């Protein structure tokens, strides 16, 4: 039998499917590279998930022997394995880097990235140059994952291992919240950059303006280039990159200094020899490597011979102990530029004292000089960073506390509100970056809900105003980092009340009516609940006017946040620059309106059919920004009909482009202009997949189905941030 790797193997006559990207089959993308990508709306469905459908991770986590798990992790830290020995006999620094790099891909611009789904296990993250040799860290964790199984996700385990690592070396932490649920394949919705080569940097324009929503400076890096911008060893220029990158992760200067200094208090960088000795990353490794990458032929290929970043050495003389020696060395010595054995820029101390030599990674009796990266020296030579770093140097307890808080924020920022946290170590303290919301202490009976709906419908507010306000409040939700949503009613507060898309004057009028209703009620009901209930009442009325007597499921329990609980700068990133559901776009972008609609739908957690039915329903309900007529293909505005779809696919009309990206819908016989539309509207007739959904909802026998599906999708958005209730309860079936 011939070796399967030989090039002269016979061609299989029965292999008709496309099973690799290297297939010689031509795909739709090859023919039509600009084709709309709807696949990001259908990720992580049941077909990829090996768990039973009834599996509930939160319930499994509650069965976990949490303290036994932490003890097993603590023991692992010093149980060095021959196949990948621990530097200094302690795996702590490796696990800190693993946890940091899991959480550190998060960016505030779109809330994507981060450690909440365990995607460091998959491409591209598992093969990023900045994640080199973290595959070894995950393999070291496997016996513990195997032991505790479904009770602890990979996502939670990686972060918890980082916490235990810090604690095992004398560092301070302030707690841990579980609840990160694994996905089972890569997140294809995340834009990591346009570069086609690792460590390429094509994401800047103008005066080093970083492309949105990216945070990292180069393809395949978590943060910044440790050698300096584009590999140039300039600490001051590096500080500029650091500040912008960490800002885009939601970190201020103090948190940035604490994280860099705290992380570099531990461990070492690895650059024992030239990178030419290092094999391919995990995704490119041969099958016999079994998912391990970066296998090195330099020396033993491990221990003191390891090659990772190319920079070589520890930062401190005590690399497995929490102390203040990082700042002491940073400020007490002058630093001279040099190169590592791998040829990377780094800095060495001038006139180093013997007591400040670091131990060798394998033999504590052998001493080697410590080093600093260009990005470390940025903390000394940038004026603002220097003030903070020197204060931490002079106040070690303040530094320890600042690091613990910044670490908790780093590892939990993408988890959403505190109500999602699980486990016995959840801190009691609320942090403003968690977007805290007061809990409510009232319940509403069905009769009370009906009375309130009647008050709202008799208040003088229109169906359009009620629907618009509810949508504006709820559609801020981002499933990426679980921020936004109707809970908290932050639409009353800065900055949301002043966003252009929310039509501030009209919004103020609607909120004033809700406040009047709230005062008149015999019991306290939150504005957040009233806004959602008002939208639901309007949808019910619109459905009744269309001939369908329906109840829109409503679950009270939302609280009203205060301005003091709302970080204006942090919430500003949630402002929509486009919302196709309201036919709104702030200005022209390089990306088409239809693509921005799909991105918005993905952030809301919607499927393609849900996106379709919501757009069609919101158009006829009059939810467009400033009542623009585009896409309102009906003569019965405010009535929940399928008219949008009926008229969209009607061949009696033709679609003619005009100026400003607007299209006219004309009668083919008379030339009469019936309606106008945007690309967002027309894509549901132009894209073959979306047209199939549009035709489905345009069918005569699917009018009722359209109403039911619209309500289910509407309720899904209204309850997207209700982590205190079960999703299946929120999506109870609609009876018509």
From Swiss-Prot:
Binding annotation for heme b? 264
Q: Which GO terms describe its cellular component?
A: cytosol
PTM comment for this protein?
A: Formation of the three residue Trp-Tyr-Met cross-link is important for the catalase, but not the peroxidase activity of the enzyme.
Q: Which superkingdom does the taxonomy of this entry point to?
A: Bacteria
GO molecular function (one): catalase activity
UniProt keyword list = Heme, Hydrogen peroxide, Iron, Metal-binding, Oxidoreductase, Peroxidase
Q: What class of enzyme is it?
A: oxidoreductase
Q: What is its EC number?
A: 1.11.1.21
Cross-link Tryptophyl-tyrosyl-methioninium (Tyr-Met) (with W-100), sequence positions: 223-249
Residue positions of the active site: 101
Q: Cofactor note, please?
A: Binds 1 heme b (iron(II)-protoporphyrin IX) group per dimer.
Gene3D superfamilies per the UniProt record, alphabetical: 1.10.520.10, Peroxidase, domain 2
Briefly state the protein's biological role: Bifunctional enzyme with both catalase and broad-spectrum peroxidase activity.
* Protein family: Belongs to the peroxidase family. Peroxidase/catalase subfamily.
This chain belongs to the protein called: Catalase-peroxidase
Lineage, top ranks: Bacteria, Bacillati, Bacillota, Bacilli, Bacillales
The primary gene name is katG
């Amino acid at each position: 039998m011939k070796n399967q790797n030989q090039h002269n193997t016979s061609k299989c006559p029965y292999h008709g499917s496309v099973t690799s990207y290297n297939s010689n089959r031509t795909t739709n993308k090859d023919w039509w590279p600009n084709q709309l990508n709807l696949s990001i709306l259908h990720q992580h469905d049941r077909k990829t998930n090996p768990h039973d459908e009834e599996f509930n991770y939160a319930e499994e986590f509650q069965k976990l022997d949490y303290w036994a798990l932490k003890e097993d992790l603590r023991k692992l830290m010093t149980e060095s394995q021959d196949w990948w020995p621990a530097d200094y006999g302690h795996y702590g620094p490796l696990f800190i880097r693993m946890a940091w790099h899991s959480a550190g891909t998060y960016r505030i611009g779109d809330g994507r990235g981060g450690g909440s789904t365990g995607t460091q296990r998959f491409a591209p993250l598992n093969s990023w140059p900045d994640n080199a040799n973290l595959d070894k860290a995950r393999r070291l964790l496997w016996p513990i994952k195997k032991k505790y199984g479904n009770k602890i996700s990979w996502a939670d385990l990686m972060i918890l291992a980082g916490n235990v690592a810090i604690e095992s070396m004398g560092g301070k932490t302030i707690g841990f919240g579980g609840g990160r649920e694994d996905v089972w394949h890569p997140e294809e919705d995340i834009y990591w950059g346009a570069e086609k080569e690792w460590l390429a940097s094509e994401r800047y324009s103008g005066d080093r303006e970083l492309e949105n929503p990216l945070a990292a400076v180069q393809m395949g890096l978590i943060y910044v280039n440790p050698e300096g911008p584009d590999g140039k060893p300039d600490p001051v220029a590096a500080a500029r990159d650091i500040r912008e990158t960490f800002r885009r992760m939601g970190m201020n200067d103090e948190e940035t200094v604490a994280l860099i200094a705290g992380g570099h208090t531990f461990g070492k960088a690895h650059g024992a020899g030239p990178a030419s000795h290092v094999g391919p990353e995990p995704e490119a490794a041969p099958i016999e490597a079994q998912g391990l990458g970066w296998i090195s032929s330099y020396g033993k290929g491990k221990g003191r011979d390891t090659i990772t970043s190319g920079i070589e050495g520890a930062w401190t003389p005590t690399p497995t102990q929490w102390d203040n020696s990082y700042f002491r060395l940073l400020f007490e010595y002058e630093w001279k530029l040099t190169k590592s054995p791998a040829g990377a820029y780094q800095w060495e101390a001038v006139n180093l004292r013997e007591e400040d030599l670091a131990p060798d990674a394998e033999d504590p009796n052998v001493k080697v000089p410590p080093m600093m990266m260009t990005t470390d020296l940025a903390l000394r030579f940038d004026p603002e960073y220097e003030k903070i770093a020197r204060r931490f140097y002079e106040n070690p307890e303040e530094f320890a506390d600042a690091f613990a808080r910044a670490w908790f924020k780093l590892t939990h920022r993408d988890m959403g509100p505190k109500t999602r946290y699980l486990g016995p170590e959840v801190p009691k303290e609320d942090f403003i970056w968690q977007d805290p919301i007061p809990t409510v202490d009232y319940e509403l009976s069905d009769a009370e809900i009906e009375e309130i709906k009647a008050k709202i419908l008799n208040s003088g507010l229109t169906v359009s105003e009620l629907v618009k306000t509810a949508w504006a409040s709820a559609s801020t939700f981002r499933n990426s980092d679980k921020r936004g949503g109707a809970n908290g009613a932050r639409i009353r507060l800065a900055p949301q009340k002043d966003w252009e898309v929310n039509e501030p004057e009209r919004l103020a009028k609607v909120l004033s009516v809700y406040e009047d209703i709230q005062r008149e009620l015999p019991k306290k009901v939150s504005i957040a609940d009233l806004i959602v209930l008002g939208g639901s009442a309007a949808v019910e009325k619109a459905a009744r006017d269309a001939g369908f007597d329906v109840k829109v499921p409503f679950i009270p329990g939302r609280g009203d946040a205060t301005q003091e609980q709302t970080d204006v700068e942090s919430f500003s990133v949630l402002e929509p620059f486009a919302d196709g559901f309201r036919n709104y776009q702030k200005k022209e972008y390089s990306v088409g309106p239809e693509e921005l609609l799909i991105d918005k739908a993905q952030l809301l957690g919607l499927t393609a059919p849900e996106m379709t039915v919501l757009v069609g329903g919101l158009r006829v309900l009059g939810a467009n920004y400033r009542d623009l007529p585009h896409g309102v293909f009906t003569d019965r505005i405010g009535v929940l009909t399928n008219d949008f779809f009926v008229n969209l696919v009607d061949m009696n009309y033709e679609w003619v482009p005009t100026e400003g990206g607007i299209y006219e819908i004309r009668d083919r016989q008379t030339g009469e202009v019936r309606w106008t539309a945007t690309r967002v509207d027309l894509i549901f007739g132009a894209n073959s997949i979306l047209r199939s959904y549009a035709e489905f909802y345009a069918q005569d026998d699917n009018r009722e189905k359209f109403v039911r599906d619209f309500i289910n999708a509407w309720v899904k958005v209204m309850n997207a941030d209700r982590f205190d209730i079960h999703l299946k309860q929120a999506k109870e079936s609609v009876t018509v």
